[in-house]
UniProtKB/Swiss-Prot annotation:
GO terms for molecular function: manganese ion binding; metalloaminopeptidase activity. Mn(2+) 2 binds at residues 269, 274, 292, 353. Its EC number is 3.4.11.1, 3.4.11.10. It comes from the Bacteria. It catalyses: Release of an N-terminal amino acid, Xaa-|-Yaa-, in which Xaa is preferably Leu, but may be other amino acids including Pro although not Arg or Lys, and Yaa may be Pro. Amino acid amides and methyl esters are also readily hydrolyzed, but rates on arylamides are exceedingly low; Release of an N-terminal amino acid, preferentially leucine, but not glutamic or aspartic acids. Mn(2+) 1 binds at residues 274, 351, 353. This is Probable cytosol aminopeptidase. GO terms for biological process: proteolysis. It comes from Shewanella denitrificans (strain OS217 / ATCC BAA-1090 / DSM 15013). Binds 2 manganese ions per subunit. Keywords: Aminopeptidase, Cytoplasm, Hydrolase, Manganese, Metal-binding, Protease. The lineage of its organism: Bacteria, Pseudomonadati, Pseudomonadota, Gammaproteobacteria, Alteromonadales.
């Protein structure tokens, strides 16, 4: 898919289709008024006849509008003027792309980016249009023998900006939107891959493939033998029941002018399949536990976006690849593990395994002397109960970092909600036999999981994103969402100091 930006009048556009907005009730947007004027009232006559009310998402495709150079004009309902919000805007873009694909238009000039969206600027509107378009066109059919094909798929979109001075802003928005979309695409592809293909070695191979095409990226892998030497006993215990080797993949991106600048570290939980281990999960929907590597998929996707944007910062991404399976060699409830940090953990439930993998990785990253560390994981079902499918859970021991991530979520539309990390919750992890348990009980499950992780992050500023509710969808639209790539990518853009404002 090719994207570009222009600034110009609709009557001068020669394209397969022009896309313009209509407000409710039957009010033409400024661009639609220009088309109506040159067509001598053709469009307003149709609206007076009741062909389109202007409700959000309504579509009316016109052919051969008088005096208009383009073959088609697509009128898009945008709701009431000045009330268009970001959610409606993205829904309208999605519906527009679907309609354009059905018409067989291979290219279109879209003026929806000139609409007023509450609290949003040109950069946001263009970038979200790119990302929403790419997301709506995504399909995972790599393993299908019969692939569905659009008659004449949309290949080129031109987004219009109001003035020529905004062209540079629009071009930057397209650049960033394409990069984030590429990251989301990779995230979704890796996460949607079945667990008999996507194991820890596969995760590592995807990272190595990326390094082959990006000079600033170096990838190394750490297998079980080296983990044992490092004392990563907690991580190793989780993978003991699987015939697939646990592999930690380290992706080092050096983009800063000073290569010695402290790196930002992103850690992704990479349980390529989580059966629960000896504490076996119920059979219903267990197939979706291939998505328990959603954190690692988000990190590799964010690293892809980072490489595409060529941001001037140093970032390390870690994919904590592992598989939690039951066997005679599996770790058990009642086991006491000595973590890489030296702290001991009593295992109460082998299905609370993500934190046992992450705690050793969070200790391992101390060697990088990081500027900050963000881990992302499909960690707890409790977070899904608390926040549903719309917001990721955010926990942090550092207020400025938490505020940065919340802001990045609002900017990108990949929002998070901060949860408490109060000292009172730590008592729920007490064990009579070890320094802590790996389970705090049913109440406040996502909070006690984050409290557990916080005990391994004392040497740097840290935040934890629980994406259990946001990394994938179930039901009819089953599949990876591509989150948390947008929030992580936006955070890195903000940290890099790249100018994006008008």
């Amino acid at each position: 898919m090719e994207f570009s930006v222009k600034s110009g009048s609709p009557e001068k556009q020669r394209s397969a289709c022009i896309v313009v907005g209509v407000y409710e009730p039957r009010r033409l947007s400024g661009i639609a008024e220009q088309l109506d004027k040159i067509s001598e009232g053709y469009i307003s006559n149709l609206l007076r006849r009741g062909d389109l009310e202007g409700k959000p998402g309504q579509m009316l495709l016109l052919h051969h509008v008088p005096n208009v150079l383009s073959e088609r004009v697509l009128l898009v309902g945008c709701g009431k003027e000045r009330e268009l919000d970001e959610r409606q805007y993205k829904q309208i873009i999605t519906k527009t792309i679907s309609t354009l694909n059905e018409t067989g238009s291979m290219e279109a000039v879209c003026f929806l980016t000139e609409l007023h969206v509450k609290g949003r600027d040109t950069y946001w509107k263009v970038r979200q249009a790119v990302e929403t378009t790419q997301a709506s066109l995504y399909s995972f059919d790599a393993l299908k023998t019969r692939k569905g094909e659009t008659r004449r798929p949309l290949r080129k979109m031109v987004f219009n900006v109001p003035t020529r001075k905004e062209l540079t802003i629009g071009e930057r928005a397209v650049e960033h939107g394409m990069a984030v979309s590429a990251g989301m695409h990779l995230c979704r592809d890796v996460a949607n891959m079945p667990p008999n293909i996507c194991n820890p070695a596969y995760l590592a191979s995807q990272a190595r493939q990326m390094a082959e095409t990006h000079d600033k990226l170096k990838v190394t892998t750490i297998g079980e033998e080296q983990m044992a030497k490092l004392g990563m006993n907690s991580y190793l215990a989780v993978g003991r029941g699987s015939s697939n080797e646990s592999i930690m993949t380290v992706m080092e991106y050096k983009g800063a002018v000073d290569s010695a600048d402290k790196p930002i570290v992103l850690v992704g939980k990479g349980l390529t399949f989580d059966s629960g281990g000896i504490s076996l999960k119920p059979g219903e929907a267990m197939d979706e536990m291939k998505y328990d590597m959603g954190g690692a998929a988000g990190v590799i996707g964010a690293m892809k976006a980072l490489c595409e944007m060529n941001l001037p910062i140093n970032v390390i991404g870690i994919l904590a690849g592992c598989e939690n399976m039951p066997s005679g060699n599996s770790y058990r409830p009642g086991d006491i593990l000595t973590t890489m940090s030296g702290q001991t953990v009593e295992v109460l439930n082998t299905d609370a395994e993500g934190r046992l993998v992450l705690c050793d990785v969070l200790t391992y990253v101390e060697r990088f002397e990081p500027e900050l560390v963000i881990d992302t994981a499909t960690l707890t079902g409790a977070c899904v109960i608390a926040l549903g499918k719309h917001a990721s859970g955010l926990f942090s021991s550092h207020n400025p970092l938490a505020h940065e991530l919340l802001n990045a979520g609002e900017q990108s539309g990949d929002r998070a909600w901060r949860m408490p990390l109060w000292e009172e919750y730590q008592d729920m992890l007490d064990s009579p036999f070890a320094d802590m348990t790996n389970l705090g009980g049913r109440p406040a499950g996502s909070i006690t999981a984050a409290c557990f992780l916080s005990r391994f992050t004392k040497k740097y500023n840290w935040a934890h994103l629980d994406v259990a509710g946001t990394a994938w969808n179930s039901g009819a639209n089953k599949g990876s969402t591509g989150r948390p790539v947008p929030i992580l990518s936006q955070f890195l853009i903000n940290r890099s100091g790249v100018e994006i404002s008008e």
